[in-house]
Curated annotation (Swiss-Prot):
One GO MF term attached to the UniProt entry: phosphatidylinositol binding
Gene name as annotated: Snx8
GO-annotated biological processes: early endosome to Golgi transport; intracellular protein transport
Keywords tagged on the record: Endosome, Lipid-binding, Membrane, Phosphoprotein, Protein transport, Transport
Family per similarity comment: Belongs to the sorting nexin family.
Binding, a 1,2-diacyl-sn-glycero-3-phospho-(1D-myo-inositol-3-phosphate): 104, 130, 143
Protein name: Sorting nexin-8
Length: 459
């Protein structure tokens, strides 16, 4: 995955290559004086990627530790009318920073862009799609949920959680958070530039890193496919519970309408007038229980949407961000490294041709270009190894999240148990009220009996 093997670089040359790129990227074109607030944000940033003691490649987090980093709520606030169209704002509240700020979708877009710029070798979750014309409430609610999943995954990601960009996004209450985010991102290069171990990433990688990467990628692809199907089934189960609630409510309303009917009976039915009156009274009273049944079914559906489907979506978002990262590795730094090697080979052949043709000036120019290209290749090789280093850590992070499966299954089982228990209680409370519906000879109640009561044993 790294292209043609390069000769090992002496450590001073490696450090020099990294420092040269750091100097180049860390000093962008002047954009005017920086505000004192941005300086303050940078001072708060511990983000020179301080590594723990021991092997820095290995993560030591548990799922509970990641979940405890922060919980961020994203709630809709009433729509405001712009010049032409309405726009949606969100109230974003962080437990960790004890902050509550207003953000628009475009603020999330800029935050996503600067994260990708600073952390190109990490799992940056995707954003939900931009609003389309005629977007309905269902679309807006779905996007709110997706934004909440995005910001919680970011807030719990180890490098992101300690970065100034996250603190800015979650707690800056000024008028233009987008400008502040871009300004903060311009002040520093990407993670490769700021990580003290970037130039030595290769030293920490296992010898079979390429094999491990291929195996992990295949495993996570299979896990994603299975969880995608589980999410679809869970959505259908929750949707059926909500549909069941609507049907039960209509069922009860129709019983109530039947019991409230005041149409006079024909003369020949006068003998049964008292019976029909009792039946109507009973039917009318049943609507209360059916409304309660509908409420219980709706609660179960909503609970499974929040506790099961949303957690499945969160895990799928994480897995998708890992798949996206693998693609960035292959199409980004790896592809650039291979192109640099190819260009280097062409230059060598051109120099050999010029030497045979006895063209001293051409040879000298080509030698200078070859030296420059060697520096490019050295830097690209360092970036490639650092990308693999980050990929290895991100793979570990996915595995830290795997126990979320048990949380999801537990929530599903508990929801089913609680839902059926509550529904059963209402059905049992309803049954005695059916007594007047079963009037037999001499007004003796004769409700239908079960097969066991009839002495029939089902086969």
């Amino acid at each position: 995955m790294t292209g043609r093997a390069m000769d090992p670089l002496p450590s001073p040359a490696v450090a020099a290559a990294a420092e040269a790129e750091a100097d180049e990227e860390a000093d962008p074109p002047a954009t005017g004086p920086r505000t004192s607030q941005v300086t303050e944000w940078r001072a708060l940033d511990p983000g020179r990627m301080q590594m723990p003691q021991g092997n820095p490649l290995l993560l030591s987090y548990t799922l509970q530790e990641l979940l405890a980093k922060d919980t961020v709520q994203v709630e809709l606030i009433p729509e405001k009318k712009g010049l032409f169209l309405k726009h949606v704002e969100y109230e974003v509240s962080s437990q960790r920073f004890k902050s509550s700020v207003y953000r628009r979708y475009n603020d999330f877009v800029v935050f996503h862009e600067v994260l990708l710029h600073k952390f190109p070798y990490r799992m940056v979750p995707a954003l939900p799609p931009k609003r389309v014309l005629g977007a309905d409430r269902e679309f807006i609610e779905g996007r709110r949920r997706a934004l909440k999943r995005f910001i919680n995954l970011v807030a719990r990601h180890p490098p992101f959680s300690e970065d100034v960009l996250l603190k800015l996004f979650l707690s800056f209450s000024g008028s233009d958070v987008q400008h502040k985010l871009k300004e903060a991102a311009q002040c520093v290069g990407d993670e490769f530039m700021n990580c003290k171990l970037a130039a030595r990433a290769k030293d920490f990688l296992p010898a079979d890193i390429q094999t491990q990467f291929a195996m992990s990628r295949e495993l996570i692809r299979n896990v994603y496919n299975s969880f995608y199907k589980l999410r679809d089934r869970a959505e259908r189960i929750a949707s059926r519970a909500i549909d069941n609630a609507a049907d039960l409510l209509i069922f009860g309303k129709e019983l109530s309408a039947l019991g409230s009917d005041t149409t006079p009976l024909p003369s020949w039915a006068a003998l049964h007038l008292s019976t029909w009156g009792s039946l109507k009274q009973a039917l009318k009273g049943l609507s209360v229980e059916f409304a309660l049944l509908a409420d219980r079914a709706a609660q179960q559906g909503k609970k499974e949407e929040n506790d099961v489907v949303e957690k499945l979506n969160l895990f799928l978002d994480l897995l998708q961000s890992y798949k996206d990262l693998c693609e960035r590795h292959e199409k980004g730094v790896l592809h650039k490294h291979q192109r640099a090697l190819h260009k280097y080979g062409l230059m060598k052949r051109q120099m050999m041709s010029a030497a045979h043709g006895r063209e001293p000036e051409s040879v000298e120019q080509l030698e200078s270009r070859i030296v420059e290209q060697e520096n490019v290749i050295q830097t690209m090789e360092l970036r490639n190894y650092f990308s693999l280093y980050c990929l290895h850590q991100e793979t570990q992070l996915v595995h830290v999240y795997l126990p979320l499966t048990s949380h999801i299954l537990g929530a599903f089982v508990n929801s089913q148990i609680q839902g059926h228990k509550e529904m059963s209680k209402v059905w049992n409370d309803l049954k005695p009220k059916l007594s007047c519906l079963f009037a037999g000879p001499h007004s003796v109640l004769t409700p239908p009996r079960s097969p066991q009561e009839d002495g029939v044993c089902p086969h």
